[in-house]
Amino acid sequence: LFALPGAFTPTCSSNHLPRYDELFEEFKSHGVDQIICLSVNDAFVMFQWSKHLGTKNIFMLPDGNGEFTRKMGMLVEKSNLGFGMRSWRYSMLVNDMVIEKMFVEPDFADNCPTDPFQSSDADTMMAFLKGSTSPGIAKPHAFVG
């Protein structure tokens, strides 16, 4: 599962979601059954975003009221960007309902002036599964929102 601040936002759309979709077969070859994208958005927005990006392998999980995100301790205020309450970026490897590994972006805070994206990416999770270190974030895709 990976969580991100919002559908149709630049980093989420140009890199975070597309890269997990690109690497799906490789994740599968390392024993991952399903990749889930979670965002504090409603189901209609998540559906249209997935359709717009053409994702094929990602289960889109809306957390419309932020309940799951709040219980994970990852709900942050992003009113400085006009977003309201959103999820902080993180990814986690879950095996039989047990979190085995979690990558949380640095500088966790309400109204964070930046949008850190250096550890919840698909390449970092893949490197963890391979028992190596991440080569870094993949280049973003073009995104027209």
Tell where the protein language model's regions lie, with residue ranges.
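Chalcogenol-based redox active-site neighborhoods
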Residues: L1-G145
